[in-house]
């Protein structure tokens, strides 16, 4: 039986979050064993924030949750791809559909999308 290898990165694995319909990469985050199990049990994506040192469910503040459609692991069992139905307009905390909205072009990084919501309004702190 395949076991996910959490040892290579100090208890964490990268989780690539992908739109299940069109294959767009929405975000990359980190999971530990607890958040992977929460994701598998609840059908919602859960992550471990390295900067805040806490667990979080995608959309818990914004309402832009992710419904898990399929989970895959790579040949080394140390990374997962989670295909999701994105509920709400955007996966990125900046308000963009994807966290990957900046493209290398003509020797510089260029933003290629506009936010779909105002983060200052959504994340009132």
UniProtKB/Swiss-Prot annotation:
Q: Which UniProt keywords apply?
A: Amino-acid biosynthesis, Cytoplasm, Histidine biosynthesis, Hydrolase, Magnesium, Metal-binding, Zinc
Q: Which Pfam families match?
A: PRA-CH
The annotated pathway is:
Amino-acid biosynthesis; L-histidine biosynthesis; L-histidine from 5-phospho-alpha-D-ribose 1-diphosphate: step 3/9
Give the residues the record marks as binding Mg(2+). 74, 76, 78
Where does it primarily localize?
cytoplasm
Q: Record-annotated residues binding Zn(2+)?
A: 75, 92, 99
What is catalysed by this protein? 1-(5-phospho-beta-D-ribosyl)-5'-AMP + H2O = 1-(5-phospho-beta-D-ribosyl)-5-[(5-phospho-beta-D-ribosylamino)methylideneamino]imidazole-4-carboxamide
For the biological process aspect of GO, one term held by this record is:
L-histidine biosynthetic process
Q: Which cofactor does it need?
A: Mg(2+); Zn(2+)
Which positions carry the signal peptide feature in this UniProt record?
none
Please give the subunit comment from the record: Homodimer.
Into which family does the record put it? Belongs to the PRA-CH family.
Provide the protein name.
Answer: Phosphoribosyl-AMP cyclohydrolase
């Amino acid at each position: 039986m395949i076991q996910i290898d959490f040892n290579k990165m100090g208890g964490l694995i990268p989780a690539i979050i992908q739109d299940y319909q069109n294959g767009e990469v929405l975000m990359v985050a980190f999971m530990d064993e607890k958040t992977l199990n929460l994701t598998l049990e609840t059908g919602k994506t859960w992550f471990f924030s390295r900067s805040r040192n806490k667990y979080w469910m995608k959309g818990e503040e914004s309402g832009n949750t992710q419904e898990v459609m399929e989970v895959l692991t790579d040949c080394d069992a140390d990374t997962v791809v989670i295909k999701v139905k994105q509920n709400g307009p955007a996966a990125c905390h900046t308000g963009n559909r994807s966290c990957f909205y900046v493209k290398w072009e003509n020797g510089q990084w260029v933003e290629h999308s506009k936010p779909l919501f105002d983060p200052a309004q959504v994340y009132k702190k």
